[in-house]
């Protein structure tokens, strides 16, 4: 689905600048390898948005006091790096922010306020976070995008350092995405597969079934037998 993925990346770019549209999704760019283009895409998006219009908030910070105050004056969340092996204990604010629901925002040395974030979020990941929340309410808010390319040995460093900052390049990108007619982000098959991997990572029962289903000889097995294997 190369063409679908190309279209998706264009539409993600458009979602960043059309931040008042209720996308109800956050984008998670996933790749365990480096040199895959995540950082370059983020650099392009930062150039499009302009300095001061985005915040860098890792996933683990959404459940911490005072970490969300920058959202009061930005239109986007762009995070290049999240720690590998991240355990996310609280996702209430994360889910609410993705879908534009109200949150209580605690501010340092100031009274808390009720706040609704109207922007768009993109997070870069090297592996799947381990969430305490296993519910589908979190899963349906995630658009997991596998970044399968690897440019090691053929890097074009000038693209990130210079090209994506050129005025004519930014004008072209902005013109293209603002003339695309859509109000939902598509979900290619490879993105659905990536979300399934994230679900499996966060559900020990799914992990177990993925391991044993292909090696079971019988089509029907006693549940007590499966439970003994699971233990």
Predicted features along the sequence, with ranges:
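Feature primarily recognizes SF3-like P-loop helicase cores of small DNA viruses
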Residues: 1-231
